[in-house]
């Protein structure tokens, strides 16, 4: 390869890198997961795009093309409301993050979350589920649909973000904090209860079911969403 060709290739690489970096806001980095490496984030027509993105200090939220650029004006899907109150979502996410980090200590100094923003992927879908986990053992993430983020308190997000923080423990090499036991669901319910003391009223059916099933063993599968009370007792006895 001639010196001119090498110089041209180097310039092209630098230009491409500068375009990609220009889309990244200041502050923490946006991690690009392995399974999204082929997605062109600079293209508004892509499934995920910097054109449909919002950031806070600790989060990046991407939403699919079907929503359009303005989540408050998203078109209906099969007659269902798909709008999302983005300011409320961002505010709640930051509030939950602060408590899980600073009060519950789910992340410690040196965490990868100090480098990367946690990721929220909003799907233009009627699927009524939400998931919390991580990308590539690097950074906590959420995968959600509009019907799980259309209430003001966002109890579902508080629960699922709990799973993201549980996963972050493993991402940071601090131990294994996810999988294989109902204890992780109990923990997310307890985390939710801590950020919303009215949880037992908002989702009173969990309390009613627990009263009917409290005779089951501590980690019995029937109670994993109903019984954060042991964790609350431990925190009262030992402190957070």
Tell where the protein language model's regions lie, with residue ranges.
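Bacterial Sec-dependent N-terminal signal peptides
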Residues: 1-24
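Generic recognition of stable, solvent-exposed alpha-helical segments in well-folded globular domains
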Residues: 160, 226-229
């Amino acid at each position: 390869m001639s010196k001119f060709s090498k110089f041209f290739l180097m310039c092209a690489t630098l230009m491409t890198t500068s375009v990609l970096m220009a889309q990244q806001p200041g502050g923490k980095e946006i991690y690009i997961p392995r399974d999204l490496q082929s997605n062109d984030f600079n293209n508004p027509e892509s499934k995920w795009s910097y054109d449909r993105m919002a950031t806070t200090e600790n989060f990046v939220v991407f939403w699919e093309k079907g929503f359009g650029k303005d989540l408050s004006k998203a078109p209906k899907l099969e007659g269902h409301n798909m709008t999302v109150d983005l300011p409320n979502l961002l505010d709640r996410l930051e509030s939950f993050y602060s408590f899980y980090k600073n009060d519950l200590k789910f992340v410690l100094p040196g965490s990868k979350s100090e480098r990367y923003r946690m990721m929220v992927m909003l799907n233009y879908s009627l699927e009524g589920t939400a998931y919390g986990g991580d990308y590539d053992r690097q950074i906590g993430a959420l995968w959600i649909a509009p019907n799980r983020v259309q209430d003001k308190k966002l109890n579902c997000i508080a629960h699922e973000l709990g799973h993201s923080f549980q996963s972050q423990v493993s991402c940071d090499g601090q131990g294994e904090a996810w999988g294989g036991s109902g204890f992780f669901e109990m923990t997310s319910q307890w985390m939710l209860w801590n950020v919303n003391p009215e949880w037992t009223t908002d989702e009173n059916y969990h309390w009613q079911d627990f009263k009917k099933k409290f005779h089951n063993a501590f980690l019995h599968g029937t109670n994993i969403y109903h019984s954060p009370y042991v964790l609350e007792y431990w925190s009262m006895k030992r402190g957070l």
